[in-house]
Amino acid sequence: MYFSSYQNLRKRLLSREISCETVVLDYLERIRKNHERNVYITVFNDQALQRAKELDRKLEAGEQPGRLFGLPMAVKDNLSVKDASLTCASKILEGYTAVYNATAVERLLKEDAVFLGKVNMDEFAMGSSNENSAFGPVPNPYDDSRVPGGSSGGSAAAVAGDLAMVALGSDTGGSVRQPAGFCNVVGLKPTYGRISRYGLVAFGSSFDQIGILSRNCDDAALVLGVIAGKDAADTTSSQHVVPDYLSEMGSVSLKGMKIGVPEEYFPETLDPGVALAVRNRLEELRDAGAELVDIALPESDHAIAAYYILTTAEASSNLARFDGARYGYRSGDASDLSGMYVNSRSEGFGGEVKRRIMLGTYVLSAGYYDTYYKKAQQVRRVFLDRYKEALAKVDVIAGPTSPFPPFGIGDKMDEPLEMYLADVFTVPASIAGLPALSVPAGFDRSGLPVGLQLIGDFFDEGKLLGIAREIQRSQEE
């Protein structure tokens, strides 16, 4: 059973050509058959089936179906789903069960979505390959020997492998967009504050944003329209009006549109296959009437350094709560309270998380605060100013999502700096808080997916999705 889009599925559900129960059973069976792919950490077998039956009864009773009636979804395992385990793919949250729903989850449930389970990720969303997971890596659906990207690798692999129609992820510096590019799906990181972070386990609080992964732009737009908007439980959520994103997408015209192409996004070190695929898509946009404008963003070289200083500083504070005293993993090898704290954290956190906690603690220390943290905050301001200046001249900014195609499992685990460079093109939009998405741009000569990234002005998600839809359509013709 395959559906090209949620709208196609919805039409068949509402006409009663098929039932929610049938659809959910089909997805659960595929998940069971693909268990060895390690995409799901927790599968909601009984809960999803019960939910599907309730929705079928609702339709039979003549009640109004929700906007996402019967949509089969996966949730990254750093989002709270009430009464379900919440692991963040970490040993330190062993045995923890969420006691409430994240706001995004609650809003989706109110519109009749169905959650199939919680998917794998890099531990506490720290990573670019999904290898930093206490539950093991996830293979790329296009090549089992390669990574799906991260940290939302399970979300991307679930959608690409047809183990969910849409998945929620989180994006701190590229964690939705980079795996979307690696897995040939759409990955949207909205404007910071567009979606409530209530119920999302924090990594870098001033960067984190819940994102959406889907096969097509229409599905992403429908989900965004449901979960976007102000939330009293999250003071950083925006009051900006939530538009009809499908309508905004429909009003997008490529004729005369100015698309900024930064020279910094096409360095000599860029993988040739990535460069070719992205250039081809940009030329198609030109052929459709858009104007490609060369722009310069010279501060881009400082993006990775500023990002890792700021996010690790926030992470060192956010992760201090995981100490073994109140919930999760507690070491049995300690003679006093201090020893219990130290051993629980040493044994419970993985290597990459400990590396970032130590880095964050270092840059916040008295002797280095001004040298590193304060300077990185100043660089962040410069980034915002430069991108605002660029977006005053062009409608969107375009370039590759990642500098290289999916790499082999284990290839970069011993080289953290090389791993960090996977996000070199996605980090700037996160630093500035701007909306950005990755859309499939084709494949390299080895048949590996390539993503094209679009960056827009604040709250321009509809425009980005509209352009991305045209890019997808051009490849289908």
Swiss-Prot record:
InterPro entries from the UniProt entry: Amidase (IPR000120), Amidase_CS (IPR020556), Amidase_dom (IPR023631), AS_sf (IPR036928), GatA (IPR004412)
EC number: 6.3.5.7
Gene3D superfamilies in the record: Amidase signature (AS) domain
Active site (catalytic residues): K76 (charge relay system), S151 (charge relay system), S175 (acyl-ester intermediate)
CC terms in the record's Gene Ontology section: glutamyl-tRNA(Gln) amidotransferase complex
Single annotated GO MF: ATP binding
Enzyme class: ligase
Keyword annotations of the record: ATP-binding, Ligase, Nucleotide-binding, Protein biosynthesis
Cystine bridges: none
Name of a matching Pfam family: Amidase
Catalysed reaction, written as an equation: L-glutamyl-tRNA(Gln) + L-glutamine + ATP + H2O = L-glutaminyl-tRNA(Gln) + L-glutamate + ADP + phosphate + H(+)
GO biological process terms on file: translation
Subunit structure: Heterotrimer of A, B and C subunits.
Protein family (similarity comment): Belongs to the amidase family. GatA subfamily.
Described purpose of this protein according to its UniProt entry: Allows the formation of correctly charged Gln-tRNA(Gln) through the transamidation of misacylated Glu-tRNA(Gln) in organisms which lack glutaminyl-tRNA synthetase. The reaction takes place in the presence of glutamine and ATP through an activated gamma-phospho-Glu-tRNA(Gln).
PANTHER family, alphabetized: GLUTAMYL-TRNA(GLN) AMIDOTRANSFERASE SUBUNIT A, TRANSAMIDASE
Protein name: Glutamyl-tRNA(Gln) amidotransferase subunit A
Native organism: Chlorobium phaeobacteroides (strain BS1)
